[in-house]
A protein has these predicted regions:
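Cell-wall polysaccharide-cleaving catalytic domain and substrate-binding groove, primarily
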Residues: 76-93, 97-100, 154, 214
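Extracytoplasmic
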Residues: 51, 65-70, 75, 88-91, ...
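Non-catalytic cell-wall polysaccharide-engagement segments
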Residues: 2-34, 46-47, 63, 102, ...
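Short extracytoplasmic
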Residues: 38-66
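A generic alpha-helix surface/boundary motif
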Residues: 53-54, 94-95, 99, 123
Length: 227
């Protein structure tokens, strides 16, 4: 029993968090649709990154996230297109999956509202950050990289790669190290490894490229705009 709990601990925790969110009343989650009132878009010359700068700033303050990071995610997900749909069903500027949005009682049609879409994406980002359970000594860049990757592919893949790195006595909280182990999860030798719970990761290179792209765009936005 102890071995089972040790191996599947993170999956049990993630399932519990998902179920808990589904049953918490909307007003107890801090999500208030009244707060998502329409804001006029900024005109050229009034914004630094996008016409949605004010919305990004407001929502980022609410959730204690760098607004420039949210902008970088939006750029990489949709080029700031609030009407974007992906072939896999992701919706809106931040490409939120409808089944994820339902955890916060947000319907698919509501995800076309930029403010609601950004807010749900921000909540998802923060929930991924909590699932990854970073020690205090982990650098902000590494925290950001792991969380961005989780936003793209889910936290379980990242946890598998970290566990694999730890098995081979590599630092499991350094992105530049663990990213190599993420790539290995496409290989049968490694996705069947005792340290791995989630099975094969078929397109790990996409997550690596996505994460590095978001980090690059974020660094550009940091040089352009103040926090």
């Amino acid at each position: 029993m102890k071995i089972f709990l040790k191996k599947y601990y993170h999956l049990i925790i993630m399932a519990a968090v998902t179920i808990a969110f589904a049953y918490i009343p909307l007003n107890k989650r801090g999500f208030n649709v009244v707060d998502m009132e329409q804001e006029p878009l900024l005109e050229p010359g009034e914004y630094i990154i996008s016409p949605y700068d004010n919305i990004f700033r407001r929502i980022a303050r609410r959730h204690d996230v760098d607004w420039r990071l949210l902008c970088a995610l939006a750029y990489c997900e949709s080029r700031f297109n609030p009407d974007a749909y992906s072939p896999r069903g992701a919706v809106g500027m931040m490409q939120v999956m409808p089944h994820i949005a339902r955890h916060w009682d947000v319907m698919e049609s509501e995800l076309l509202d930029p403010a609601i879409n950004i807010d749900v994406a921000c909540r998802l980002y923060k929930s991924m950050q909590k699932m990854l359970r970073f020690p205090k000594e982990v650098s902000e860049r590494d925290k950001m990289a792991f969380t961005i990757a989780s936003y793209n592919c889910g936290a379980s893949r990242i946890i598998d790669a970290r566990n694999l790195a730890a098995y081979y006595d590599e630092p499991k909280y350094e992105w530049d190290v663990v990213s190599d182990y993420i790539l290995l999860l496409s290989s049968e030798e490694f996705y069947n490894h005792e340290a791995v719970c989630g099975g094969q990761f078929k397109e790990p290179h996409i997550t690596i490229a996505y994460t590095n792209k978001v980090l690059s765009v974020y660094e550009k936005y940091v040089s352009m705009a103040e926090e």
